[in-house]
Every structure is written in C-alpha cells, then in structure tokens.
Amino acid sequence: MDLLGTTGAVAISLYAALSTAYKGMQAIYALPTNTTAASTPVTGSGAPPSVDVIVPCYNEDPRALSACLASIAKQDYAGELRVYVVDDGSGNRNAIIPVHDHYACDPRFRFILMPKNVGKRKAQIVAIRESSGDLVLNVDSDTTIAPDVVTKLALKMYSPAVGAAMGQLTASNRSDTWLTRLIDMEYWLACNEERAAQARFGAVMCCCGPCAMYRRSALLLLLDKYETQLFRGRPSDFGEDRHLTILMLNAGFRTEYVPEAIAATVVPNSMGAYLRQQLRWARSTFRDTLLALRLLPGLDRYLTLDVIGQNLGPLLLALSVLTGLAQLALTATVPWSTILMIASMTMVRCGVAAFRARELRFLGFSLHTLLNVALLLPLKAYALCTLSNSDWLSRGSPAAAPNGVKDSPEPHC
C-alpha cells in the first residue's frame, strides 16, 4: 500500500474508532433517566418565580411575529409573566406595528423600539436591563412555543445551581422542502442526542437561542462579559447563545435540557440560507471551543470526549475524503474501503435514531452525509480560515427606524 492509501486507511480507521466511541457513549447518556423535574418554586416564599420573556425582532415577517407573540400570550404559567418585544431598528416597522397594537392593551406586554439596528445581543441586553423578573426566557421572533414551555423550563430552574435551560427545537416549516425535513431531523438529533447526553452532567454546551431560559442573578454577574465579547480584538456579534452558555459554565452554573419544552422555529428552506446559517454557527463554535477547553478539567470526562468528537471527528472525515479523492484522481481506483466505512456508519446512526424516535423517516437522514461531505466540510474549513469575520450574512444592512422612536407609543385600545 502506498503513502496515499496508508494515509486514507489510517484516517478512516481513526474516524471510525472515534465516532464509535463518541456516538456510543452519547447514545447511552442520552437515554432518559426517568427522573421527574422538581416542582417546588424557585423563590423561598412559595410563589412561582416571575419570568420575563424577551423577543428580539429584526425585519421579521409580521405573520411569524404574530404567531410568536400569540404562543407566548397563551402560556399556562401560574406565576407573573412579562413580555418585552425589542424591535431592533427594523426597516419594515410599519408592517409590524399592527402586530404590536394587537397586544397594546395586554398589561404583560411592553414594546421597545430601537432607533437603529444594534444587533440581537445588544437588543437582548436592553430588555434584560429594563426588566426585573427572577428568570429570563429568550424566544426568537420566528419561534412559537408550546403553552407549557415557561412552566417546564421554570421547574428545571428550581435549583439555584442551574443557570440556564433550553427546550427542544423543531422546525415549524418542516413540510416546506426536502431540506427543511432534513433540518428538522438534524434538530431532533442535536437536541435528543447531543444536548441530552451533555445534560446528564449538567453541562449543555449551547443553550440554543430560540428557546432558552436564564437565571437573572447569574445573568447580571455575566452581563458585562457577554456584552463586550471580543475575538482577536474585534467585537463578536453572533453566536450569543453559545457564548452565554460557556460563560454560565465558566461561572460554575449548571446548564440543562428540557425535552418536554417544545419550541418550533422557522428553518432555512433554501440551500443558500442554510449554508449561511451553518457558516455563522461554525465560526461561533470554533471561537467558543477555545473557551470551552478551559472548562473541561472541571467537567465529566464525557464532555472532553464530546469536544474531541465534534472537532477532531470532522477533521479526520475530511482527511479521509481528500485522500479518497486523491486516490481516485491519481490512480483511477475507487476508495471502496472509505466509502463502505462511511456508508455503514451512516446507516447505523440513522437506524439508531429511527429506533429511538420511533420514526422511519430518520432513515432518510443518510442524505445528510452526502450534504456534509460535499458542502459542510468545505464550509467548516472556510469558517476556520475566516474566524475574524463577524458578518451575520443573513442580516440586511443596518436600517434606521422611522422617526427615531425609542419606546412604544401610547396604547390604542
């Protein structure tokens, strides 16, 4: 066997060994523990903790925003609930003002209109500083939450050791295209395998932004660091959910996952939008992995395997693919061993997912392997080479809000 063949064989063998160990342990730790969530209120008075729901909004579709706010208004939470909708300098403000007006007479709702676009993170922080609830729930403006989400997340926050908790994400537009169906399965796996396994040790590495609850006392301790995140001396304006989660863990708080708290969010329905989203996520993951490495000595050893599996695994897979392509180009021989290894591992993973979810559609997730090899691996390489780029890609250019309004107008009941 020549050098090229040897390199390919070693790379795919190491990838298979690492993936088997990582995914095997992940599958075990992701199994339900049959422990019931605590049902005692967080506050010592016996009353449920007050909850502030923050909804940052930028150029949102009025229908999506209306559905989001309607789902929040229907929460069955027994405690005090307040809602802060922050319009981050939207250019379509005239179109969404009627949505605001619909809730103008609901005393739970307050609308904050930013005079210009400042970014999701700063919009969040404005609402955090304006509000005062015991717990803070972030909900993206294109996300709808089940009626019991606030209740279930607040129960998970019973212990003062818990700094953050996230719900389970699904794709609200799952039926749109083959891509949205694939992303919906991707979300299920990310939540019910990756996050569920991490939560076994109280260390969910990213409490996803569409539906994540935080303890205010913990937030206030970390707010300055969160607001002033820098990367290579420049402000970092995306990946706020992952960075805030890492800050929580670094401060000694637990981060949890609540699969019963269901949130449905709009996912990209075109390949271009999906790849732009994945590029942002890859950059933020690489950036915050450097911070996460410092946490690993204080966490369970599984989390070390998790970080290695998520970062070294794609590198070994990319090396396997590159050597396979080189073998095909230089020797005109098909790298069957690499192809068969990747295919067999894909089918095993999809089979396990289909069994756990009790849904045969997960067998179709094998298509994601082709997408991963053809597009996502090169995209991750590009992300690694452009870590300093903080462009959101999906955002339009900052738009000034009409009339420079800073707060909501008088309600019209």
From Swiss-Prot:
Keyword check for Membrane: yes
Keyword Membrane: yes
InterPro entries, A to Z: Chitooligosach_Synthase_NodC (IPR026463), Glyco_trans_2-like (IPR001173), Nucleotide-diphossugar_trans (IPR029044)
Topological relation to the membrane, as annotated: Peripheral membrane protein
GO molecular function, one term: hyaluronan synthase activity
Subcellular location: Cell membrane
GO CC annotation terms, alphabetical: plasma membrane
Family label: Belongs to the NodC/HAS family.
Protein name: N-acetylglucosaminyltransferase
Species, as recorded: Sinorhizobium fredii (strain NBRC 101917 / NGR234)
Gene symbol of the encoding locus: nodC
